Amino acid sequence: VKRAGAGVKRAVAAMKPEVGVSETAPGDVSPRLGVSSCLLGQPVRFNGGHSRNRFVSDVLAGYVEWVPVCPEVEIGLGAPRESLHLTSEGQLVSTSGQDHTAAVTALAQRRRTELAGLAGYVVKSRSPSCGRSSVRVHAGGQIVTGNGREVFAERVLAADPLLPAEEEGRLNDPLVREAFVEQVWARARLHRLFGGPWRLRDLIGFHARHKLQLMAHDPVRAHQAGHLVAIAHAGPDDQVRAEYTALFGAAIARRVSRARHCNAMHHAFGLVSDHLDDTRRRDILATIEAYRRGEVPLSVPVTLLRHHADGCSAVYLAAQTYLDPFPAGLGLRNHAPGPSAPSGKSGQSRQSDRAPAPKTAADATKGARG
C-alpha cells in the first residue's frame, strides 16, 4: 500500500498544472444546497413572517446555489396558517387536529430526484415541517421532548444518510459552521468528479489532492480509500465509484480534532521543509504548536504553509485541498479554540488523541513524506 500511495503521488506530480492545481480552487465549485425557504427571507412561516439568517442569505448565498424548500407551503397550506406540531407517534398535525403527515411524506417522495444531488442542507431549527433534531414533540396537548425529527427531513436524510445537514442555529458555533461548510465543498467536488464520465486518472488526482484533508478527518478511512484507488483498475467503475463515495463521505463527516489538524500540518511541513532555512522551519513549527495550545486560529499555520508551498513551487502541497477546503471569502478558520475547550464542542482533542509535539524540524519530518 505504501508503494501504491507513492505511485498516486507521482501520478499527480506528473500531471499538467491545470489538472493538478487549478481544480483544487474552491471557487470553481458552486455547491447546490437545500434550505428552508424562511431562512432566505421568504415570508412562508405560519405567522406570515420569515426567519432570515444572515450567514445563509448574505454570506453563503454568494457561493452556493440554493434549492429552497417549505413543505407546509408546498402541500398547499398558506401563510399565515394554523401552526403544526409533531406528535409522539410521528404525525404532523395542525392546531385543529388535521393530519398532514401523508401529504408531507408524498412531497418528500416527489422531490427526491431534485434533492438527490445536493451537497448539503440547512434547515430551520424547531420547525415541525423542516427541522432536523430539535423539533418539539407533543402528546396530550403537552410538549414531552425537544428532540424530534420532522417528517420531511427524516425522509430526505434517510435517502442520503451522509448528506451534510445542519440547523441554522447550530451554525452560530464557528466550529460547527466550519465543519459543515468543509463537508459541503468536499461533497461538491466529489459530485463534480463522478457527475459525468471519469477516468482512473481523474480519481487518482482527486484522491491525491484530498490526501491531507482525509488524513485530518479520518486516518483509517483515508488509508482504506487510498488502497481502493490503488486497486481501482481491477474493479468495475460503478463499484469503485460507490465504494469510494461511501469511504470519502464517511471520512469527511468525522469532526477533525486539534491533534489530527496538527498531524496533517506536520505532514504538510515535511513536504516543504527541505526548501526552507532553519528560521522559517522554526517559524512554521512554532505556529503549529501555538495552534495546538489553542493560542492562534487554524488559519495562522495553514496560511504560513500555503505561503511557503507557493513560494517553493511545491506543486503537490499547493494542490492539497486541506490548505483551501472552501472559499477564503467565507472567513472561516479564524477562531482561536482556547486552551480549555472541550473535545465535543470546539475541537479540543482528548489527551489520548494527542501526539507529542515535535521538538525539532527533523522530528516533524519523520514519516511525513509517505
Where are these regions (language model features)?
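Short beta-strand segments
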Residues: 36-37, 70, 122-126
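Internal, conserved structured core segments that host functional sites
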Residues: 113-195
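Glycine-rich anion/phosphate-binding loops
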Residues: 97-115
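Short catalytic helix/loop segments, enriched in acidic residues and glycine
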Residues: 49-66
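Compositionally biased, intrinsically disordered low-complexity segments enriched
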Residues: 1-19, 339-359
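Acidic, Ser/Pro/Thr-rich low-complexity regulatory regions
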Residues: 165-341, 345, 353-354, 359, ...
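Short N-terminal binding/cap micro-motifs at the start of the first secondary-structure element
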Residues: 40-48
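Short, surface-exposed acidic-centric catalytic microdomains
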Residues: 57, 68-90
